[in-house]
Design a protein with these regions (language model features):
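Sec-dependent signal peptide recognition
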Residues: 2-9
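Residue-level signal for mature regions of secreted extracellular proteins and peptides
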Residues: 9-10, 163
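C-terminal motif of bacterial Sec signal peptides marking the signal peptidase cleavage site
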Residues: 13-15
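Compact, glycine-rich, soluble single-domain proteins
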Residues: 17-175
């Protein structure tokens, strides 16, 4: 019985130890969100972004809420499959965002620049879209991105790279 008690005490001490296990050391790497490449072709050039993807309804509901910053070439993609009329607001969003509503042909249907933090006013293109892309507020203007510009993502955006994703968006080139 003493041997069992000693093992239990040792196990409790080990479990409460503050030294990280091998799994804990890897936790920040696992916690880092995977990104998806997006390329936007505009009159002023081609621009690449590496964005997070909000796939689930829960991820889409949270979006970029509570973020204090966003990388210049970062953002978040909200895929709509099947395409639908999407409406977004900025409640609990701390930073301004550019919202790009993307037609099923890959063109930007509507661009809401610098959506105001904490606003409860809905933002929508008013038509079904394939996705909404959120970028750091003002970034679209900095790069000359406008309505009518064309997007692709996943392996279609960077065909020279091997992208392991089921989120390839390959609209037909403009005629």
């Amino acid at each position: 019985m003493n041997r069992l008690a000693a093992l239990l005490v040792f196990g409790l001490i080990a479990a409460c130890s503050s030294s990280p296990s091998a799994a804990d050391k890897d936790a920040p790497a696992r916690a880092a969100p995977a990104t998806l490449p997006i390329v936007i072709r505009s009159a002023k050039g081609t621009h690449r972004f590496d964005v997070e993807v909000a796939r689930t309804p829960q991820e889409q509901e949270k979006g970029l809420m509570f973020r204090k910053e966003l990388a210049a070439d970062g953002g978040m993609l909200f895929p709509m499959n099947p395409p639908r009329t999407a409406s977004f607001w900025m409640k609990d969003t701390l930073i301004p965002l550019d919202m790009l509503f993307v037609h099923t042909d890959g063109t930007i249907a509507f661009l809401q620049a610098n959506a105001q933090p904490y606003s409860r006013v809905p933002v929508s293109a008013g038509i079904p879209v394939a996705a909404v892309l959120e970028l750091r507020g003002g970034r679209a203007a900095e790069l000359g991105i406008a309505e009518g510009d064309r997007l692709a993502w996943g392996g279609c955006a960077v065909s020279q790279e091997k992208i392991a994703t089921d989120l390839n968006f390959c609209p037909s080139p403009a005629n």
